[in-house]
A protein has these predicted regions:
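Short, surface-exposed amphipathic charged segments that create phosphate/polyanion-binding patches used
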Residues: 38, 139-142
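Basic, amphipathic alpha-helical patches used to engage nucleic acids or provide basic targeting signals
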Residues: 72-95
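Short beta-strand-loop-alpha-helix junction that forms the active-site gateway
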Residues: 63-75
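Nucleic-acid nuclease catalytic cores
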Residues: 87-120, 130-132
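Charged, structured surface patches that assemble and position nucleic-acid processing machinery
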Residues: 121-140
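Nuclease catalytic cores
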Residues: 2-7, 11
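Active-site metal-binding core of divalent-cation-utilizing nuclease and nuclease-like domains
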Residues: 20-59, 74
Length: 142
């Protein structure tokens, strides 16, 4: 399995943000086939507004680099992959939240278009925006 260009950047950003990487990659059965979400991670939650039943928040992260010549083609592929993994994960681990990790540079140039900001809401897309230079998490869009 080939890792995305920014794979290690996202791993480091999540660790800096207090997450423990539990799966690299995270295997997900898709029908009779195998799918691999880039990462699985968990974080102990402290504080009332983030508390869950067992005090643990679990996520899966699909990383996309968006470094080809066409942002739109990259996004179409990422959205399709996100939806496929979302439905597979819903059956396997319904409490684990799936995020699409995207670089800050791509986020700034692509999501200034209201069409795509509406699409995030309509498609229930969860996004983790990471700074590809600092290797930090900049924004969680839930």
């Amino acid at each position: 399995m080939v890792k995305d260009f920014y794979h290690q950047h996202v791993v480091e950003a999540l660790i800096k943000d207090g997450w423990k990487i539990t799966h690299d990659p995270f295997y997900v059965p898709i029908g009779n086939r195998r799918g691999y979400i880039d990462l699985g991670a968990e974080k102990s939650i402290i504080g009332a507004e983030k508390e869950s039943n067992d005090g643990l928040q679990q996520i899966a992260v699909e990383i996309k680099s968006f470094i080809s010549k066409s942002d739109l083609n990259d996004f179409e592929g990422a959205l399709g992959k996100f939806q496929l993994y979302f439905f597979a994960l819903e059956d396997l681990e319904p409490d684990r939240i799936l995020f699409l990790a995207i670089p800050l540079g791509f986020y700034n140039r692509f999501f200034n278009d209201t069409f795509f900001t509406k699409l995030i809401r309509r498609a229930n897309l969860k996004i983790l925006v990471f700074d590809e230079q600092d290797k930090t998490v900049n924004l969680w869009i839930k």
